[in-house]
Amino acid sequence: MTIASTASPVPAAAGLDRQSRNRRALRLWLGLVILALFALVLVGGATRLTNSGLSITQWKPIHGVIPPLNAAEWEEEFKLYQQIPQYELVNKGMTVEAFKTIFWWEWAHRFLARSIGVIFALPLVFFWATGRIEKRLRWPLVGILALGGFQGFIGWWMVSSGLSERTEVSQYRLATHLVTACLIFSACVWVMRGLARHSADPAPTAHSRHWAIALLCLVLFQIYLGALVAGLDAGMSYNTWPLMDGALIPGDLLVQQPVWLNFFENPKTVQFVHRIGAYTVLLVALYHMVSSLRAAPGTTHARRSVVLFAIVCCQAVLGISALLLQVPLDAALAHQGGALILLGFTVAHLRGFYGAYPLPKPVA
């Protein structure tokens, strides 16, 4: 009598369960990193809006973690600040106590940045060493870590632009710094979303995917424009809506020569372009939602497009409110936070077109 032997499903099931647990751990880790990045960008925004970014005039990646601890150290730090143009031309006569306020914003921003490096690097090493990271994700995660390290250099490059001749940082370098932060944020959201389960709904059309890609690019570009607005204090140029001081198109948008310079250095032009960018994002999000509802009604993809359009509308309201209120700190930070939420959801929405990362075959 011959007895047929079959492979037991238990090892395979155990392997899949282990992979699911590993993915859940990675999602929790990346979720923590994303929340920390969100906080970092908001603190960075507050640092810029309170003109605190030049309060620390030296780059000490390790020793700089420790702030001044006594009166003598505060005086020493304050003397360094008194040597730059911002103090001489903007804050002449500032007291040590007033200096402490702007110092703590910049210190908190740098401390958060260093902390995120630790929060990302140490778990990455642990997960890699214990085999919890799938091979396809190892080098992309290392790439994110490397980009984070490079972001530290970009931050100092930005600060250094305001230490010799200018009284504020270069808006070009500020925009580079913010966009790089958004790329790191987006990459973490992309990987985290790929590790989660996806809907079993039919795959969306290529047409919808192309528009989702376009929307993500527009959101990133709009954030870049927002950084130029912040760097030039362009939010104070026109504080009316929908018109700009009574006109749809003001007459002083192209006063600088050469003409292209207006789009980067004329505060009025930069605000105008940022407004046009917002309208463009709104229209593209509306079209994407309508086309998705028509092509795939009732699917998760279509519902996501509705949520995405709603977030765009909320962000537009936040932007208009900040403008009409003449850009108070709380309204400006709410608008910046809204931009990050919009960016994160747009990335997650686009990731939904590609589904979750396939699970590796478990080793029996």
Swiss-Prot record:
Q: How does it sit in the membrane?
A: Multi-pass membrane protein
Q: Which residues bind heme?
A: H274, H335
List the GO molecular function terms.
metal ion binding; oxidoreductase activity, acting on NAD(P)H, heme protein as acceptor
**Coiled-coil ranges from the UniProt annotation:** none
Give the primary localization class.
membrane
Role according to the record: Catalyzes the conversion of heme O to heme A by two successive hydroxylations of the methyl group at C8. The first hydroxylation forms heme I, the second hydroxylation results in an unstable dihydroxymethyl group, which spontaneously dehydrates, resulting in the formyl group of heme A.
Subunit: Interacts with CtaB.
User: Can you tell me which family this protein belongs to?
Assistant: Belongs to the COX15/CtaA family. Type 2 subfamily.
Q: What is this protein called?
A: Heme A synthase
Please name the gene that encodes this protein. Answer: ctaA
